[in-house]
Amino acid sequence: MTPEYFLRSLLMMILAVFSANASNWLYLAKLSSVGSISEEETCEKLKGPIQRQVQMCKRNLEVMDSVRRGAQLAIEECQYQFRNRRWNCSTLDTLPVFGKVVTQGTREAAFVYAISSAGVAFAVTRACSSGDLEKCGCDRTVHGVSPQGFQWSGCSDNILYGVAFSQSFVDVRERSKGGSSSRALMNLHNNEAGRKAILNNMRVECKCHGVSGSCEVKTCWKAMPTFRKVGNVLKEKFDGATEVEQKKIGSTKVLVPKNSQFKPHTDEDLVYLDSSPDFCDHDLKNGVLGTTGRQCNKTSKAIDGCELMCCGRGFHTEEVEIVERCSCKFHWCCFVKCKQCHKVVEMHTCR
């Protein structure tokens, strides 16, 4: 494959990413690298309707690989968090990558938008701290001595830069259209909730200095939570998401709980407009793979149990042989040696 052909192919894929759906940029996760976007002329060829994205590309060529990594993080975390649910974040080789699931105003779409905006903020911030980007570095506003008496030092994660870039890049489609439709307001709210899942869970990491670890001096820095922590927080918000509707207060359109008996949602909560399908049956047109063939837990009464996972269709049971580590022993010094044991277990899959 010639460099020219590769570049043309890459441009066609990225052009598709910036069309139609606001979450189509997630398709960048399926590209091995976007390093070929290294000249402003390349960005000019992105003839998508959102010119501000083209301008961002031109001004931030080096950041695009972090956007790709953010998309990968988002998809991987979504698949982990929903691994035991009927909808398990399966991706398609088409646009949008989650199918039409994200084009509906469901709570699943709310999670996808939140984890995606968080993924970009996280990946860009990590690139800043790693010294991979010229435009940003560590957070130099964190310095001096803290009220607790330790010295701020090291490389504090520049989360504000990552959040600002995520806002500019991820929110651009909704904001370019005025951001006043019900769906635009929903997307913008969930995008921000995703970023707040990082901001509100920043932690302080420290290192002791002194003779024999006496900690005569302690230096600390601010660090982002793990992305697994971010995913856990947003999954909890998904479980307690608020169904909303649009209401006009004065000249401003806002989202309010559809049930007036419910308390107003906060900036950290996820919101949705439409009820979710049951995800039971195969419907590739809408990006729903169904649950036929999915593994289930025979003894569980939760959503991963065979009764709920299989939507009442029943399940198959077969015996399979697995190999696992066993009889592990620690040997001085310093390794663990295990045997391989063969074990026959029952595996249950939905009809």
From Swiss-Prot:
PANTHER family cross-referenced by the UniProt entry: PROTEIN WNT-4, WNT RELATED
Disulfide cross-links: 78-89, 128-136, 138-155, 206-220, 208-215, 280-311, 296-306, 310-350, 326-341, 328-338, 333-334
Lipidation (O-palmitoleoyl serine): 212
Location(s), subcellular: Secreted, Extracellular space, Extracellular matrix
Induction section of the entry: By Notch signaling in the pronephros.
Pfam families on file: wnt
Protein name, per record: Protein Wnt-4
Main localisation: secreted
Source superkingdom: Eukaryota
Xref: PROSITE patterns: WNT1 (PS00246)
Keyword Lipoprotein attached: yes
Similarity annotation: Belongs to the Wnt family.
GO cellular component: extracellular region; extracellular space
Keyword Endoplasmic reticulum in annotation: no
InterPro entries on file: Wnt, Wnt4, Wnt_C, Wnt_CS
